[in-house]
Structure formats: C-alpha cells, structure tokens
Design a protein with these regions (language model features):
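Alpha-helical transmembrane segments and their immediate juxtamembrane cytosolic regions
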Residues: 1-231
Length: 231
C-alpha cells in the first residue's frame, strides 16, 4: 500500500478489551430486542449501543485486515471465503435444518435465511474484496478508498454501503495508530462532544437495519430487517 510501512506489532490487550465490550453490548442489545421489551427501538441503552457497535466492529476488522490485503485478489478471495463465508453456510444449514425438525420457532426455518444470516461476515468479505480490487487497479490508497466507497454505494445487501467507510477508517487507524495514540485524549473528547450533540436527533428507527440506503430493490433476496438481524 503506497506511502505506508507495516509495523510488526505484538498482540494489543486494548483491542481484546475493546472487542469484549462490543460483544457484551451486542448481547445486551439482542436481549432487549428478542425478549420482547416494549418499544426497544426507543430504549436509551439500545439507542446508545446501536449508535456505534457495528461501525466499531467494522473499523476493528479493517484494522486487522491490513496484512491480509497484501495477498493477491484470488488468494484473498479464497482464504476469506473459507474463513468468513463457509461458517455462514454451515451455521445456516445446521440452524435451519434443526429448526425445521423440532419446530422450535417459526423463524429461521426458511432457506432464504441463508442470504441474511451472519450478515456481518458477508459484509466484511465484500468490503475486503472491493477494497482489494480498487487497490489492485490504482496502487494508491486514497484513490482506492474513493473507488471502493463509490462501488459500495448501491450495494445495500448486508449493509455494505454503510459498512465500507468504517472498514477504511480501520485501515487508516492502523497506519496512523502512533498519531492516534498520541492524540487519543483529544480525539475521544471531540468524538464524545459530537455524540452528545447528535444524541437528541438519534433514534432506533434511524439505524441502517430499519432505513437502509437503497438505490434499487433486491426484494427476492431480502430478509425481514432488524427482526432477523444478527447484530
């Protein structure tokens, strides 16, 4: 990647803590969602968690994708299809088959769920391939970021158009990690101020799961939104 050097970094406990917090947030938000909490979309904790948790996951994924992006496009597609897509397929087949046998719930018993299940892994796969394709064509990070963001705009399936900016944010996070670490207090303070200022305007109905950015319809492939969302 032009203009950047790669640093041999040891495991950072900061990211382990960050991922643990994000996972706990997802679990709690899903409890509010699936346990029938009334008006969960307006619940303050649900609103707070859904304001940041999936962008955070994608930014962290972008951060850790930097070295994998040095593979060729074919190698990257092969490696990540095994690590990201195969679990989606196998988990979906097991869950749908099991549910059809025991009839535990009327959800997750349609094979169309294979399109939407574990959507985040599919979104990450597409983001990586789009970014790698753009990098292969341009050999320039800024141009690649712009091209992949434009490519992602019409791709609302798996919320790719929503997630792509955060994937690139994670890549920039990696390359400018020393600067970010030095300015962490200022960055966090500014981000917190913006969060507080924008909070009154934010609502659960504004999430990408309820109001996705769409330029065309893929209705035959759609799953039913937040009710079936995995995050």
């Amino acid at each position: 990647m032009e203009g950047y050097h790669f640093v041999n970094k040891t495991r950072n406990p900061y990211f382990d803590t960050l991922k643990a917090i994000a996972i706990l947030c997802v679990g709690y938000a899903h409890c509010l969602q699936y346990l029938g909490i009334e008006s969960y979309l307006h619940h303050p904790l649900f609103r707070a968690i859904y304001a940041f948790h999936m962008p955070l996951f994608m930014a962290v994924s972008g951060y850790f994708s930097v070295h994998a992006m040095q593979l060729s496009l074919n190698e990257l597609a092969k490696k990540k299809s095994i690590r990201l897509l195969l679990p989606c397929l196998t988990a979906g087949i097991v869950v749908i088959s099991f549910n059809n046998v025991i009839g535990l719930t009327d959800r997750y018993n349609d094979w169309k769920e294979l399109v939407g299940n574990l959507w985040y892994l599919k979104s990450l796969f597409v983001c990586m391939l789009m970014a790698k394709l753009a990098l292969t064509l341009t050999k320039n990070n800024m141009k690649a970021a712009i091209i992949s963001l434009l490519l992602a705009l019409p791709f609302y399936l798996w919320h790719v158009n929503f997630m792509m900016p955060f994937f690139w944010l994670g890549i920039l996070w990696y390359h400018y990690s020393d600067f970010i670490q030095r300015k962490a207090l200022i960055i966090c303070a500014v981000a917190f101020v913006f969060f507080i200022l924008l909070w009154p305007l934010w609502d659960g109905y504004h999430t990408t799961y309820i109001t996705p950015l769409r330029f065309f319809s893929l209705s035959p492939l759609q799953w039913t939104g937040l009710q079936h969302a995995d995050s």
